[in-house]
Amino acid sequence: MPKFRVSLFSLALMLAVPFAPQAVAKTAAATTASQPEIASGSAMIVDLNTNKVIYSNHPDLVRPIASISKLMTAMVVLDARLPLDEKLKVDISQTPEMKGVYSRVRLNSEISRKDMLLLALMSSENRAAASLAHHYPGGYKAFIKAMNAKAKSLGMNNTRFVEPTGLSVHNVSTARDLTKLLIASKQYPLIGQLSTTREDMATFSNPTYTLPFRNTNHLVYRDNWNIQLTKTGFTNAAGHCLVMRTVINNKPVALVVMDAFGKYTHFADASRLRTWIETGKVMPVPAAALSYKKQKAAQMAAAGQTAQND
């Protein structure tokens, strides 16, 4: 109970103290003190015009990234310059992480490479991501090798991939590294187009069937967000993750939120950070989310900040 009273007091104090946006530019101490608290384990926002860090919170904490991995999957596919209209068979045979994972997509049915990319990016379809890797020149292992080589070339020094979907806890990165991935994504306009598609129908062949798919990022449905590229991710180990290239305060930014508590917490944190940047207002964080963050931080400290399955 004493801890609960302290949390309420801290929250009341935070809300009671007026935020002075002019003080942000005056001193580094004022900037640090005025930064908002978030519910997520780590985050970073970078101004894409200047590469200046606007906000960071534990940006170098190495954590599982879940389906954020699919952004790298898409980049490696496009780097290979393979025909986008080629029909690919749904194949997960070399992705053991897929065992027992439900999907509406039928094994061995076929759809174009471009539609595979759409389903992987827009709706985070795991069988689509795995199939893209299975149909890579040189095979599945060559694809994973290319993912890691791409990460290294981008200076993502704390990033590692072992499979293309993000289901493995060993697909890890940091908020800082993921901003580098977002910066690189500017060279892939198709990824931006597909990842921000709100919804679509996918028609498969052999056998023929059609399925509806929707975007996993709820913010793409809001007209007050200008989102140019996005990807969400979730596993129990990674928590809820969100990356976006978007516009905040009339500036293009790369936004990364990792290891958030609750189904909508990563979206709420993105909105909190946007509000702070645009207005200087600090929005409160629910006590349950802060408790989750504290517990995760303790677990990471006990494990020496290594990525482990919870």
From Swiss-Prot:
Record Gene3D superfamilies: DD-peptidase/beta-lactamase superfamily
Entry EC number(s): 3.4.21.-
Amino acids binding substrate: 231
Superkingdom per UniProt: Bacteria
GO terms for cellular component: periplasmic space
Keyword field contains Signal: yes
Hydrolase as UniProt keyword: yes
Active site: 67, 70, 124
InterPro entries: Beta-lactam/transpept-like, Peptidase_S11, Peptidase_S11_N
Major localization class: periplasm
Residue ranges the record marks as coiled coil: none
Keywords annotated in UniProt: Cell shape, Cell wall biogenesis/degradation, Hydrolase, Peptidoglycan synthesis, Periplasm, Signal
PTM summary: Pbp8 is a proteolytic product of Pbp7.
Enzyme class: hydrolase
Pfam hit, one: Peptidase_S11
Signal peptide: 1-25
Entry's Gene Ontology molecular function annotations: endopeptidase activity; serine-type D-Ala-D-Ala carboxypeptidase activity
Subcellular location: Periplasm
Biological role: Cell wall formation. May play a specialized role in remodeling the cell wall. Specifically hydrolyzes the DD-diaminopimelate-alanine bonds in high-molecular-mass murein sacculi.
Family (UniProt): Belongs to the peptidase S11 family.
Further facts: In E.coli there are three murein endopeptidases: two are penicillin sensitive (DacB and PbpG), the other (MepA) not.
UniProt cross-references to NCBIfam families, sorted A to Z: PRK11669.1
Protein name (record): D-alanyl-D-alanine endopeptidase
Source lineage: Bacteria, Pseudomonadati, Pseudomonadota, Gammaproteobacteria, Enterobacterales
